[in-house]
Amino acid sequence: MGMKRAGDIQQILRPVHAPISPSGEQAELSLGEQTAVVVGLGGGLRSYSVDGRAVLDGYGVEEMCASGRGQLLAPWPNRIEDGAYEFDGQRLQLALDEPERQNAIHGLVRWSRWSVVEEDDDRAALEYLLHPTPGYPFALALRVEYSLGEDGLTVRVEATNVGREACPYGIGAHPYLAAGEGLVDELELHVPAETALIADERSIPVDRASVEGTDLDFRTPKPIGPIELDHCYTDLERDDDGRARVRLGQVATLWVDESYPYVMLFTGDPLPDVARHSIAVEPMTCAPNAFRSGEGLIRLEPGGSHRGSWGIYPA
């Protein structure tokens, strides 16, 4: 076998050293006045605009994703207290990637490289295989599909247990609806939810309460005002099509199908890059800390799958 020439080696190395986007592969979608960009990093949604107006508070192609913008959160959304949980007799410990609160947060796949497996002008599908890891010794095949249509942007997600034993599962997403030039304070918010989860200083739910008569009651649309939202809502009122719809003024509506019983609302006050310039409306299949509390937790048997969908359309 002959030796490789220097030129051959340079050809091999050049792709490795070529600059890449911090968010990886970019799939650009368009339909009429709508445009969206989905990315290989975490299978996330980097931007969504209509007629040149940003519906989402996204980030640039040369920027690193910050504050969870547009990320997918699996195999759990939000937090796990102490990163510790028990499942089928196994005591498991996850890395504490929110060290200031001693929590595990937002799953294991949002910083992983997903593969774009299908791509058309108005649609892209990405997949990722989550191998067993310390703290989550289970195998999941994940797929997300983003599509543009007359009813806006639709996101379909599917998870399949490809391991040999049952596994705990939940999924969420972290899009921020943009407030435009101003703050969210003046925008009317409509959240058709009867119940809010009450969290402690570590953002772990410790109780649940009716929103009736509280500042958290947005069942009738009203301006957000100065309230700092970092609350999980549930007991959602659904329309005849089974969808629950969260509406933000003249910005957008985010809907969830029946596989998402929870929606997290976050005005981003502790995060300078998003604080009150946008509001995260986070679809979630389970409550925060579900791996410990069991609230909304999905059990996937070997070969079992879970599917869900949510979407956004402009006002």
Language model region names:
Residues 85-93, 157, 299-315:
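Short Pro-Gly-centered flexible turn/kink motifs
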Residues 96-150:
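Extended, loop-rich substrate-binding clefts of extracytoplasmic carbohydrate-active enzymes
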Residues 35-91, 96-97:
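Acidic-aromatic substrate-binding/catalytic surfaces of carbohydrate-active enzymes
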Residues 4, 93-94, 176-259:
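Active-site/ligand-binding surface loops and adjacent short beta/alpha elements
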Residues 143-145, 295-300:
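Beta-strand-rich interaction surfaces with strong enrichment in secreted/lumenal proteins
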Residues 2-32:
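Short, Gly/Pro- and small/polar-rich lid/capping loops
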Residues 36, 128-180:
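Acidic, contiguous internal or C-terminal segments within carbohydrate-active enzymes
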Residues 247-283, 288:
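Glycine-rich active-site loops that engage anionic ligands at enzyme catalytic sites
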